[in-house]
Regions:
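Beta-propeller blade signature
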Residues: 83-85
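Repeated scaffold domains used in trafficking and secretory/extracellular systems
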Residues: 54-59, 99-112
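Generic detector of ordered, mature protein regions
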Residues: 70-75, 95, 106, 111
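N-terminal export/targeting and maturation segments
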Residues: 12-66, 70-72, 78-81, 90, ...
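N-terminal Sec-pathway targeting helices
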Residues: 1-10
Length: 132
């Protein structure tokens, strides 16, 4: 009987809602935390109730207005995220959109972001110096 209960648990587990497939996570502010997907090597930004705000957290930066960072795993999907702490909204971006949005908001994007992009795609990112 015990074996049956354990087997049922593992059969049902993959069908749980996406947000529930995580450990408790690391609390980084009063309103959100970084959580790890169960069975994956990926993290995501979640609110206190566990609802996903932005997927793919690899390295992040916290300011008074934003929490932002990037995912170093899948470059063909959204790799950067920005979470607005005032509106409590998060959004994912591809590499170029992420860099543009960081510049638009006056955020300095994480230094390792270009290194991860180079490792995944084999091509370095080149940005013009300020004033050119």
């Amino acid at each position: 009987m015990r074996f049956v209960k354990i087997a049922i648990f593992f059969i049902i587990l993959p069908y749980l809602p996406y947000e529930s497939k995580a450990f408790w996570g690391y609390k980084i502010t009063n309103e959100c935390r970084i959580k790890k997907h169960l069975f994956q090597k990926k993290y995501y930004l979640a609110d206190e109730k566990g609802k996903m705000l932005a997927d793919g957290v690899f390295e992040w930066t916290i300011t008074d207005e934003y929490i932002y960072g990037f995912d170093g795993y899948e470059s063909e999907y959204a790799v950067g995220f920005i979470y607005d702490r005032k509106t409590k909204q998060g959004e994912n971006f591809d590499h170029d959109e992420f860099v543009s949005e960081c510049k638009r908001l006056g955020l300095e994007y994480p230094s390792r972001f270009d290194n991860i992009y180079t490792l995944q795609n084999g091509l370095p990112r080149v940005y013009p110096l300020q004033g050119e």
